[in-house]
Amino acid sequence: MARKTKQEAQETRQHILDVALRLFSQQGVSSTSLGEIAKAAGVTRGAIYWHFKDKSDLFSEIWELSESNIGELELEYQAKFPGDPLSVLREILIHVLESTVTEERRRLLMEIIFHKCEFVGEMAVVQQAQRNLCLESYDRIEQTLKHCIEAKMLPADLMTRRAAIIMRGYISGLMENWLFAPQSFDLKKEARDYVAILLEMYLLCPTLRNPATNE
């Protein structure tokens, strides 16, 4: 019985997150109250506060769920491409772009992040968390690029930090621009080519090479 109750609580929590995601996308984060989320979800405000401290906590949970899915995907591709970190990286980047088009939850989240969230007031704490995630992502990307170098799949003198910054800006920019004007280009159809362009830049761009040092 206790197990069923725990399962029901988890289902209620996920339902609240799904409803909040939809309302945030429709109305913007600052214009959506916890009371509106409770009403739309068919639960009491008390139920909302039982699961989440406040709106920023709820929003952070939505973001963290998205991030955890990427981690699971990485493990899946590592099993599919053992000893081939560049293919793992390529497929993850393609998935990130394609899923922005094909997966409603991810698309709504990206719309909110890029276009429908003001990081002021109670949401200021979320902005700091996003900054921390951004810095952590640079570290993760850089580590992945170093693995590719060790596997002799990228140039040994690649400036990995600069390459990591470029990657995040490039992928984020593609998603943000497509979400703003979906009719302007076919992100799903062209995702693989955009990723190929990025990785070819790492292979061929001289400005991404560490300058030779004279001893």
UniProtKB/Swiss-Prot annotation:
Keywords: DNA-binding, Repressor, Transcription, Transcription regulation
Biological process, per Gene Ontology: negative regulation of DNA-templated transcription; regulation of DNA-templated transcription; response to xenobiotic stimulus
Entry keyword Transcription: yes
PROSITE patterns xrefs: HTH_TETR_1 (PS01081), HTH_TETR_2 (PS50977)
UniProt-listed InterPro entries: DNA-bd_HTH_TetR-type_CS, Homeodomain-like_sf, HTH-type_Tx_Regulator, HTH_TetR, Tet_transcr_reg_TetR-rel_C_sf, Tscrpt_reg_MAATS_C
Ranges for domain HTH tetR-type: 10-70
One Pfam family linked to the record: TetR_N
DNA-binding region: 33-52
Keyword Protease among UniProt keywords: no
Cysteine disulfide links: none
Superkingdom as given in the UniProt entry: Bacteria
SUPFAM superfamilies (UniProt xref): Homeodomain-like, Tetracyclin repressor-like, C-terminal domain
Any one Gene Ontology molecular-function term assigned to this protein's record: transcription cis-regulatory region binding
Function recorded in the entry: Potential regulator protein for the acrAB genes.
Name recorded for this polypeptide: HTH-type transcriptional regulator AcrR
Organism, as annotated: Escherichia coli (strain K12)
Phylogenetic lineage: Bacteria, Pseudomonadati, Pseudomonadota, Gammaproteobacteria, Enterobacterales
Gene it is expressed from: acrR
